[in-house]
């Protein structure tokens, strides 16, 4: 929770940096409370430690048990701290979505796990020495004038590429160009990424501002999720696309190249709200990385005309001011690479699809709707997607 009398439950107190006033958020209450469940956990660990001499046969075994117990305590405390940070960082995503309108777009970026080339029929020897095909996913979210949220996905496929800031900036430029063509009224952009080095570096942070100015849009924010902070929009969309490709493979086709992968994604009418680009990124001759000491500790950035305002935890304190004058913007712009669209596609139409809220039905509601009957009709069973189970066997698309 944002405010609590328990010290490590209060986000303002736990995530503030007492050594830096820029990252310090004041609380209006005293932290003199205690959590009964947290105390129970600590008490249980103490009881385990007290019982170790009773179960250890030798001193070496006792030392090993003590070490394992101490490691378990540290892991539990680290996990608890991670949950607090993850909730706080997710607040940035929620607030950005609430601010969206029909002139702004929220972009979530991530590299999907490489796809291994596969044949419809392949021998065991064909399985070895494969090189995965890299692909990048960008999910764009906007809010229509009637307050309905819409999303679309940009997929960039590569034969081979380095997953570095140079490639990411090329993808950013391509996405902004396509969005500006399809949405002439676009004026604001928000970014959210994970903590991969290709995103969480000075070159990407500063280069994104240069690209936005070049595209004629205003870059408002860039936020980073907490490491291992659950699945995001890109992971969910990647799972849908992989399932679609599996159907194409089961139909007797091969997926061994980036071009065949594009054909698989676009087969059978394609995946709703997904546009695919067969891409190539030219190698730069010079790679002068932008230097910014301590950038890996910054998780939230707000772009202003004269400066950057940065935080190490979302909304904790007024933030630290970083002037644009410390970066050499002309040099950065000269070194930016552009994505080469191998099929030279520039669609004016952006396939945005409406986002439908998920509704969860409790067990009690389900039981009451059945009217106490043990046997429902076949039509009732088929009408609920929550009662469908997919076959776990690879290659099977049956549901039960």
Identify the meaning behind each predicted range:
Residues 1-398:
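Extended mixed-charge, aromatic/glycine-enriched low-complexity segments
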